[in-house]
A protein has these predicted regions:
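Accessory DNA-binding and partner-docking regions appended to nucleic-acid-acting proteins
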Residues: 1-4, 340-341, 346-361, 367-372, ...
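Helicase motor core with emphasis on the C-terminal RecA-like subdomain
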Residues: 2-11, 15-19, 23-45, 52-55, ...
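Aromatic/hydrophobic pocket-lining residues that form π-stacking "cages" and hydrophobic walls in ligand
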Residues: 48, 317, 375, 459, ...
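Short alpha-helical segment immediately N-terminal to, or the first helix within
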Residues: 27, 304, 378, 485-486
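Short alpha-helical "packing" element that flanks the helix-turn-helix/winged-helix DNA-binding module
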Residues: 21-24, 375, 483
Length: 526
């Protein structure tokens, strides 16, 4: 009989769970509802994907964005999991085919938008089949206290109640204050849930803040981007105009950049997002419309060109860097103009004719102002930035982390901070071992030799060819950390390859011979 550990190894290629994952999996398998708050990159999806493959029926994953569904399902299919998504990106014929296959038992995991739960065709399907688990991803969207409130999330409970047999319910989010957690419990009506908040600490991330006048920001931004060379990155701007101007600035300097915001048509947004995911462009310049659920693991830097509206948004967006556990850099540029822009948007929401009572809108504006206050404090505080973030999310925080701009400034003159970034990244790599098992982190002795670097380059090239042939993002073949481990360990058999973190049985069967062949050729030619 399969166990959670055997599924983790066989399907996903990992020997052990990360902190917090195994207990969540066990509780869901035992039929207990779960409310899990885990930072971006902590492995939330494993927590519901593993039990989904062990429970008898189908798991429905409620997800807010088409891009998130496509990304998650693509990765699952590559790992050999029978998964599908149902949303408006499909034609009517494709939707009908997907539902027919679901009725025939093709799938174990189905991703849907919350609005889909109310549609008669899907409701009929849900009545006919055993739904073992309903997973609510990005669960903070259910709360008016949250930064991404979506009224459609409030109707998830009605769908669960309508099922012939109540499934176990798992709610997952990356950022949730006490108010948001209470809303999640109440609006989903979780039954005596197991609640867990794993550490928000991301030791591999270097945090920096820089005050810059609007006229100074273009030069500061270019300096930061040029230091990153060919690394993948995301630049967040507060307005569509700023996104377009910044994209043109980068492109004028020969930097491969693309834009993403709501005023672009759907086809352009989709093309630009794919170009970023498939490594055809280096940098995505975007409003906060981009990124929720994007699982590109090798983003090495995130720059906020403008201050976000709150720390929840900032930490979620910054957390899209370094999801592979490797060192990454998160920089916030801010000025007084940013605060005025955010207040303009708050006032605009107050004046909007959205059908909400005046007292409700006034309370929402008050909450937004409160969150903005803490965001402003973060931008200007002289204390440890990591400590400030962890304290805000209710976690014990160190007085200094030695891996943020403020901690470096405490010991060095301001003009030396950027020169110390490389050393900060090395410290981040070492401290990242605290976040996950050693098998998923680069140990000090794991430095690549010159020959290993050549092998790694050959593995990257092979991955790129295989991904292009299948029209997949490269990381869906194997992520960077897995290729690095191949270059270090140099497996020469399928058995040895399966010992590399991130290599499951299906991927070994699909890609193993080609990667083993490349390794053997490079090793024998030395």
């Amino acid at each position: 009989m399969e166990s959670p550990h055997s599924i983790l190894k066989k399907v996903f290629g990992y020997d052990s769970f990360r902190p917090g994952q195994e207990e969540i999996v066990s509780r869901l398998l035992a039929g207990q509802d779960v409310l899990a708050v885990m930072p971006t990159g902590a492995g939330k999806s494993i927590c519901y994907q593993v039990p989904a493959l062990l429970l008898p029926g189908i798991t429905i994953v409620v997800s807010p964005l088409v891009s998130l569904m496509k990304d998650q399902v693509g990765a699952l299919v590559q790992a050999g999991v029978a998964a599908a998504f149902l949303n408006n990106s499909l034609t009517d014929n494709q939707k009908a085919l997907m539902l027919r296959r679901a009725r025939e038992g093709w799938y174990k995991i189905i991703y849907v938008a919350p609005e889909r739960l109310e549609m008669p065709g899907f409701q009929r399907f849900a009545q006919e089949w055993e739904i073992s688990m309903v997973t609510v991803d990005e669960a903070h969207c259910i709360s008016q206290w949250g930064q991404d409130f979506r009224p459609s999330y409030l109707r998830i409970k009605a769908f669960v109640d309508s099922l012939p047999k109540r499934p176990v319910v798992g709610a997952f989010t990356a950022t949730a204050t006490a108010h948001v957690r209470e809303d999640i419990r109440t609006h989903l009506e979780l039954h005596t849930p197991y609640e867990v908040t794993t550490s928000f600490d991301r030791p591999n991330l270097y945090f920096a803040t820089r005050r810059a006048l609007p006229s100074e920001k273009p030069k500061v931004l270019l300096d930061l981007v040029l230091r990153e060379r060919d690394n993948a990155g995301i630049i967040y701007c507060s307005t569509t105009r700023q996104v377009d101007e910044t994209t043109r600035l980068l492109q004028s300097r020969g930097i491969r950049a693309a834009a993403y915001h709501a005023k672009l048509d759907a086809d352009t947004r989709r093309q630009n997002q794919d170009d970023f995911l498939y490594d055809r462009v280096q940098i995505m310049v975007a409003t906060n419309a981009f990124g929720m659920g994007i699982d590109k693991p090798n983003v090495r830097f995130v720059i906020h060109y403008n201050m976000p509206k709150d720390l929840e948004s900032y930490y979620q967006e910054a957390g899209r860097a370094g999801r592979d556990g490797e060192p990454a850099r998160c920089t916030l540029l801010y000025s007084g103009t940013d605060v005025r822009t955010i207040r303009f948007f708050i006032d605009k929401e107050m004046e909007a004719d959205n059908g909400l009572p005046a007292d409700v809108k006034a309370e929402a504006a008050r909450k937004a102002e409160e969150r903005l206050k803490y965001m402003t404090f973060y931008s200007t505080t002289p204390r440890c930035l990591r400590g400030y973030l962890l304290s805000y999310f209710g976690e014990a925080a160190p007085q200094k982390c030695e891996n943020c701009s403020n901690c470096l400034l405490a010991a060095q003159a301001a003009e030396q901070v950027e020169e110390q970034a490389a050393q900060a990244r090395q410290r981040a790599a070492a401290s990242a071992k605290r976040l996950a098992s050693a098998s998923r982190r680069r140990a000090d002795e794991d430095a690549l030799s010159e020959a290993d670097e050549k092998l790694l380059a050959a593995l990257y090239a092979l991955r790129k060819r295989l991904a292009a042939k299948q029209k997949l993002p490269a990381y869906m073949v194997f992520n960077d950390s897995t290729l690095r481990q191949m270059a270090l360990k140099k497996p020469l058999s399928v058995e040895e390859l399966l010992n590399i973190p991130g290599v499951g049985e299906k991927k070994a069967a699909r890609y193993g011979q080609e990667f083993l062949g490349t390794i053997e050729d490079m090793v024998s030619s030395r």
